[in-house]
């Protein structure tokens, strides 16, 4: 079965793997997934990620991050836009996630950025997901 929403699949795999306390999870490679993972790493939600190839297909191995009590750093990660329902926002109407404790990831004309960066640059875009 073909995956039509690679971002949604990635978010689900990250959520499920962190809930059962896996050390890592393998995801299908896509530029959007790579951009989102760069933000998650920069914001401290994952340890790291690297690329590996199995039978000619490139995967991304994500090393998940836990606190000192072995609780996942990612408490909740949810897709906002889907292939059938794209949600856009201007920088003025950008929603806050968990009263500023979470992050919003958006796809803008300047690439995939956080909601805070979008407000600072005064650009809007498609709301991809929220993380806290």
UniProtKB/Swiss-Prot annotation:
- Any one annotated GO CC term: ribosome
Protein name per the record: Small ribosomal subunit protein uS8
* UniProt xrefs under HAMAP family: Ribosomal_uS8_B
Protein keywords: Ribonucleoprotein, Ribosomal protein, RNA-binding, rRNA-binding
Q: Does the keyword Ribosomal protein apply?
A: yes
List the Pfam families: Ribosomal_S8
What this chain does, per the entry, is described as: One of the primary rRNA binding proteins, it binds directly to 16S rRNA central domain where it helps coordinate assembly of the platform of the 30S subunit.
Family statement drawn from the similarity comment of this UniProt entry: Belongs to the universal ribosomal protein uS8 family.
The record's subunit annotation is: Part of the 30S ribosomal subunit. Contacts proteins S5 and S12.
Q: Does the keyword DNA damage apply?
A: no
Example GO BP: translation
| Listed InterPro entries | Ribosomal_uS8, Ribosomal_uS8_CS, Ribosomal_uS8_sf
One example GO MF annotation: structural constituent of ribosome
């Amino acid at each position: 079965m073909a995956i039509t929403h690679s971002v949604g699949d990635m978010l689900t795999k990250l959520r499920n793997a962190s809930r059962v306390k896996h050390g890592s999870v393998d995801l299908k490679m896509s530029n959007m997934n790579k951009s989102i993972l760069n933000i998650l790493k920069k914001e401290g939600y994952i340890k790291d990620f690297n690329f590996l190839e199995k039978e000619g297909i490139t995967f991304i191995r994500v090393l998940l991050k836990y606190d000192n009590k072995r609780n996942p750093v990612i408490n909740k990660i949810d897709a906002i836009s889907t292939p059938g329902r794209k949600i856009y926002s201007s920088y003025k109407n950008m929603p806050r996630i968990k009263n500023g404790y979470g992050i919003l990831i958006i796809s803008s004309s300047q690439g995939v950025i956080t909601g805070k960066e979008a407000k600072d640059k005064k650009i809007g875009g498609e709301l991809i997901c929220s993380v806290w």
